[in-house]
């Protein structure tokens, strides 16, 4: 059997599929390589592009769907710990999206045969941006994030965001697939034939090498936007290593004891701390609610203990907690509305009675925190509730806190995975980004590093220091250029006191045009596919339908 025939066989397609899934998962943080392997990312998509090239139309849809389900299933396996339904939802939607994407890749290659390499690369990049949008937005798995530790290369994100890094990572896969595909389809497969296939794409390869070289040299020469600190701030990041989802007043009291112990340890050794940060939902009882409505005496008492504790200190506290209000329904009844909140308490100012500055989480996790289609799909909403989904109301205001002259914002949980959110905070005056998260439920180091990899890009894009206080990790301090300044050991209680640089100037092209490059990839790929389809139809009409 010839190599080309073998590659087009079911066994060949299956092996390409397995290789594609494996390389995608290994490129990003995973159980085998908790920090991922950045080098593998440059060829991770080549097996998929070859599979699309050689498979028939129906097979392309099948393998695309299978690739979506298995690649994202392997990538985000930790969702199973949260709930099997969550993993099924991600795998299911990924299967649908990748089936459609692979069909688009096949069409793009057929419509623009001579330029198939660039067209397929563009279509993939357009997909990566599109999959971060809307209710189903899922930024995990963007290829650019695999390079989070390659600091000289990713400094270009300060101008064009993560999308330019993705372009640099995806192109070699498309190039390699094009060269290998051309070589396999030759009648003679020897070194000369391979070099001939590679030579036919030498211009695009040279441009890619030049762009990568420029990015690295520009970083070494300091050409990218300046991130010189004007002042510094000392922040205590508390990592209790608990699990707020356990529930029960005794569990909440035990977590509170751990939080206060770690905070006291930090404040005794570093009395000049500017801010103490507790993670997302670190204190579960609704502070303002239980202080106002004292029906649950044990919760009220725990709230009083918290307020007395904070008011006795000499520095502000950011506390991740539930926040609730009474709201009148359309039927005229009153109901409680819950928010996932970050609360700023300043001792002697807004602690007793509690009237903290508030930020309510705007970008909620689909299906597990938020489902806006209750009236359209009431049966599915009820199903999610029975699966222990915790629904929150959606916040609407981008809040910039201010304490001791420091202006900062607090993206909650996976909000630091979306560039437009942190960009908006910085546009409104934030000079420090403080992320509070709870990834403890996943019990996965690779999950925590996947989250961290995206946070690194948010720091670079905005040229702002970003600190993370996470329940079980990764609790880190990130410099404006993406360097990890310090990091706590994961899955252990501790507190990280970080002295971080504060940049106040508006610097970096990303601050001005945001995700414009991602939008361009998306719009351009749609235009090229439509133009290619029209061009193909016109040619068929001229040649006669057969």
From Swiss-Prot:
Primary location group: membrane
Coiled-coil annotated spans: none
Domain annotation CN hydrolase: ranges: 233-502
Swiss-Prot/TrEMBL keywords: Acyltransferase, Cell inner membrane, Cell membrane, Membrane, Transferase, Transmembrane, Transmembrane helix
UniProt EC number: 2.3.1.269
Subcellular location: Cell inner membrane
Keyword Nucleotide-binding attributed: no
Pathway annotation: Protein modification; lipoprotein biosynthesis (N-acyl transfer)
Top-level taxon: Bacteria
UniProt entry tagged with the keyword Kinase: no
Gene Ontology terms, MF aspect: N-acyltransferase activity
PROSITE patterns named among the record's database cross-references: CN_HYDROLASE (PS50263)
Family as reported in the entry's similarity comment: Belongs to the CN hydrolase family. Apolipoprotein N-acyltransferase subfamily.
Described purpose of this protein according to its UniProt entry: Catalyzes the phospholipid dependent N-acylation of the N-terminal cysteine of apolipoprotein, the last step in lipoprotein maturation.
NCBIfam families given in the database record: lnt (TIGR00546)
Protein name: Apolipoprotein N-acyltransferase 1
Organism: Treponema pallidum (strain Nichols)
Underlying gene: lnt1
């Amino acid at each position: 059997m010839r190599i080309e025939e073998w590659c087009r066989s079911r066994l060949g397609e299956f092996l390409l599929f397995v290789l594609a899934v494996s390389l995608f998962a290994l490129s990003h943080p995973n159980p085998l390589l908790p920090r991922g392997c950045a080098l593998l990312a440059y060829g991770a998509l080549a097996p998929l592009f070859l599979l699309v090239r050689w498979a028939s139309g129906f097979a392309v849809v099948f393998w695309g769907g299978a690739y979506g389900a298995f690649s994202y299933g392997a990538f985000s396996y930790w969702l199973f710990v949260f709930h099997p339904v969550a993993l099924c939802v991600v795998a299911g939607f990924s299967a649908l999206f990748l089936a459609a994407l692979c069909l688009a890749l096949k069409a793009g290659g057929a419509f623009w045969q001579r330029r198939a390499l660039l067209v397929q690369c563009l279509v993939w990049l357009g997909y990566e941006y599109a999959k971060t949008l809307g209710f189903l937005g899922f930024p995990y798995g963007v290829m650019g994030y695999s390079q989070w530790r390659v600091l000289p290369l990713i400094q270009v994100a300060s101008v064009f965001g993560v999308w330019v890094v993705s372009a640099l990572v995806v192109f070699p896969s498309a190039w390699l697939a094009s060269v290998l595909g051309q070589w396999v389809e030759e009648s003679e497969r020897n070194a000369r034939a391979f070099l001939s296939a590679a030579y036919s794409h030498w211009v695009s390869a040279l441009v890619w090498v030049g762009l990568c070289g420029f990015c690295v040299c520009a970083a070494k020469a300091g050409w990218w936007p300046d991130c010189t600190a004007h002042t510094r701030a000392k922040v205590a990041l508390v990592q209790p290593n608990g699990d707020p989802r356990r529930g029960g007043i005794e569990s909440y009291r035990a977590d509170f004891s751990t939080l206060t112990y770690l905070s006291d340890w930090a404040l005794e050794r570093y009395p000049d701390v500017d801010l103490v940060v507790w993670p997302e939902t670190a204190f579960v009882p609704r502070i303002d609610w239980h202080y106002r409505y004292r029906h649950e005496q044990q919760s009220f008492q725990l709230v009083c203990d918290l307020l007395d504790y904070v008011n006795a200190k000499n520095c502000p506290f950011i506390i991740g907690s539930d926040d609730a209000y009474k709201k009148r329904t359309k039927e005229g009844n009153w109901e409680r509305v819950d928010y996932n909140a970050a609360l700023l308490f300043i001792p002697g100012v807004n602690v007793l009675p509690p009237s903290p500055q508030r930020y309510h989480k705007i970008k909620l996790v689909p299906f597990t925190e938020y489902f806006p289609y209750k009236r359209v799909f009431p049966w599915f909403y009820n199903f999610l509730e029975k699966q222990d989904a915790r629904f929150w109301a959606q916040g609407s205001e981008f809040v910039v806190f201010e304490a001791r002259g420091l202006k900062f914002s607090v993206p909650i949980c996976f909000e630091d995975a979306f560039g437009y959110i942190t960009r908006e905070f910085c546009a409104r005056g934030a000079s420090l980004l403080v992320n509070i998260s709870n990834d403890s439920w996943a019990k996965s180091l690779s999950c925590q590093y996947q989250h961290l990899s995206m946070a690194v890009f948010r720091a670079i894009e905005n040229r702002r220091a970003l600190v993370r206080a996470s329940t079980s990790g990764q609790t880190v301090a990130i410099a404006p250029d993406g360097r990890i300044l310090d990091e706590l050991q994961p899955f252990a209680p501790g507190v990280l006191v970080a002295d971080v640089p504060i940049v106040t100037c508006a610097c970096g092209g990303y601050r001005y045009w945001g995700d414009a490059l991602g939008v361009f990839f998306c719009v351009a790929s749609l235009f090229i596919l439509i133009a290619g389809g029209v061009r193909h139809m016109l040619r068929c009409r001229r040649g006669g339908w057969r």
